[in-house]
């Protein structure tokens, strides 16, 4: 039987309305809306948002994702500044950037990502910036361009276990390729993060193995969440994990050495992002290192 998404009672407060109006007014997009994120009211209600840059149309066809697929529009050269203006107007001290895949662009959009980070830093130097990036087809120089742009956190999701990757993700993605992206980012000295969706048909032992693989390339922050089928066009849910199973996996992750583990059915990559980043920084400081993990 397909797992049903929990029904939540939410309150739309003034902060939510402020974010919604500002985002619409500047013509910038958020993944909160585009991917039907279950935490939209929580995050927007706290005056935070994850901005989706480079359009709303993805060049890939991952079988779990609700984001529109097709031929994207050309990039908006003013978008980095529009996003920076939105971040400044909202007074955010932590912002997450993400995007669709743009395999139609020579660098996959890496330079656009970097320009957006720099634009934010020019207006708000103390704002912590996280970028949840595509794999840029595994091209090392493109990953390094974003990782060295001045951000604090680089996230890239492996999404699922190695065995299911060909079924779940687009054929141009790769499990080992994604691990290498995270390894390159860590070489640039930034905090790294990755997420795994549970309930796509994996065994728990495969999840633990994927967690070990992430630690082997130095990933600091792990996010585990339940897969919910956005529509009948996506893969069905194979299993619904219990809260106790999430707690068990979180405990295993902490024992493996992750600085922070977000494990909850409704968790997404940007959920509790600031809290997770600060935990990673505290770990580095406790070990006698610098600011970055």
UniProtKB/Swiss-Prot annotation:
Q: EC number(s)? A: 2.8.1.8
Task: Give the species this sequence originates from.
Answer: Aeropyrum pernix (strain ATCC 700893 / DSM 11879 / JCM 9820 / NBRC 100138 / K1)
Q: Which HAMAP family match?
A: Lipoyl_synth
Tell me the leader sequence span.
Answer: none
One cellular component term (GO) for this entry is:
cytoplasm
Family statement drawn from the similarity comment of this UniProt entry: Belongs to the radical SAM superfamily. Lipoyl synthase family.
Report which gene this protein is encoded by: lipA
**Which NCBIfam families would you find in this protein's record?**
lipA, PRK05481.1, PRK12928.1
Q: What is this protein called?
A: Lipoyl synthase
Annotated residues that bind [4Fe-4S] cluster 1 are located at 32, 37, 43, 270
Family matches, as InterPro entries: Aldolase_TIM (IPR013785), Elp3/MiaA/NifB-like_rSAM (IPR006638), Lipoyl_synth (IPR003698), rSAM (IPR007197)
Top EC class for this record: transferase
Cofactor binding mode and count? Binds 2 [4Fe-4S] clusters per subunit. One cluster is coordinated with 3 cysteines and an exchangeable S-adenosyl-L-methionine.
Query: Which residue ranges does the record assign to the Radical SAM core domain?
Result: 44-259
Which Pfam families would you find in this protein's record?
Radical_SAM
């Amino acid at each position: 039987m397909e797992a049903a998404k929990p029904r939540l009672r939410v309150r739309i407060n003034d902060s939510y309305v402020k974010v919604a109006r500002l985002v619409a007014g500047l013509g910038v997009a958020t993944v909160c809306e585009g991917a039907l994120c279950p935490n939209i009211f929580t995050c927007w209600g706290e005056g935070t948002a994850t901005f989706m840059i480079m359009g709303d149309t993805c060049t890939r066809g991952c079988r779990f994702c609700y984001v529109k697929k097709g031929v994207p529009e050309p990039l908006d050269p003013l978008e980095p500044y529009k996003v920076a203006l939105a971040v400044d107007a909202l007074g955010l001290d932590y912002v997450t950037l993400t995007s669709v895949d743009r395999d139609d662009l020579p660098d996959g959009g890496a330079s656009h990502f970097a320009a957006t980070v720099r634009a934010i830093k020019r207006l708000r130097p103390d704002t912590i910036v996280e970028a949840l990036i595509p794999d840029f087809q595994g091209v090392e120089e493109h990953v390094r361009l974003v990782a060295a742009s001045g951000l604090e956190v680089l996230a890239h999701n492996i999404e699922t276990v190695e065995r299911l990757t060909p079924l779940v993700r687009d054929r141009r993605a790769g499990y080992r390729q994604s691990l290498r992206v995270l390894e390159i980012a860590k070489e640039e000295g930034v905090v790294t993060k990755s997420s795994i969706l549970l309930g796509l048909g994996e065994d728990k032992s495969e999840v633990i193995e994927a967690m070990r693989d992430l630690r082997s390339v130095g990933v600091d922050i792990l996010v585990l969440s339940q897969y919910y089928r956005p529509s009948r066009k996506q893969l069905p849910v194979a299993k619904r994990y219990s809260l106790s199973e999430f707690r068990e996996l979180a405990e295993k992750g902490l024992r493996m050495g992750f600085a922070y583990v977000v494990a909850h059915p409704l968790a997404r990559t940007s959920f509790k992002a600031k809290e997770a980043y600060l935990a990673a920084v505290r770990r580095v400081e406790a070990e006698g290192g610098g600011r970055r993990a």
